[in-house]
């Protein structure tokens, strides 16, 4: 069986919230983006089954309280520099999700995604992100199992196969996001 060869600027592997958000940001930078998903985009990931709740400095929750809560929950082994970035950006990044069609309910120190239901509370996050990513030109490679990364010292692509028909695929990319 022949190998299908695809080239792109940015290959993103995984269609959970992180992969979708990364694909949207890369596309906003004007590059060609290919999002590879092992099933239909946005279906088989932890984000869709998440509770759809986030902590951030909203209402009476200050950034200092958010920082302390996060460090305590992490049993003091967190990378405090990364926690500072999280605390500084959490509220604005959560509000930014509304630009992509995500409906939010914001309370004191928390933010919940609406439009999800058990067992897929995170559907209210994932489905709008998939829709937005498609609308801005993110290309989707669905039902594709990525089995290996390409490159020696520097990753410049990946290989895998279509889970439905067995077709093999090789993807060349200037950047790869896992």
List the model feature ranges, each with a label.
Residues 4-8, 164-175:
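Core beta-strand elements of the Rossmann-like FAD/NAD(P) dinucleotide-binding domain
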Residues 25, 31, 38-162:
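Conserved N-terminal/central alpha/beta ligand/cofactor-binding core
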Residues 10, 17, 159, 171, ...:
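Mobile, glycine-rich extracellular loop/lid and propeptide segments
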Residues 62-66, 171-178:
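Short coil-to-beta-strand
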Residues 1, 21, 162-166:
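A generic local structural motif
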Residues 1-10, 17, 139-141:
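N-terminal charge/polar-biased segments
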Residues 9-35:
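N-terminal Rossmann-like FAD-binding beta1-loop-alpha1 element of flavoenzymes
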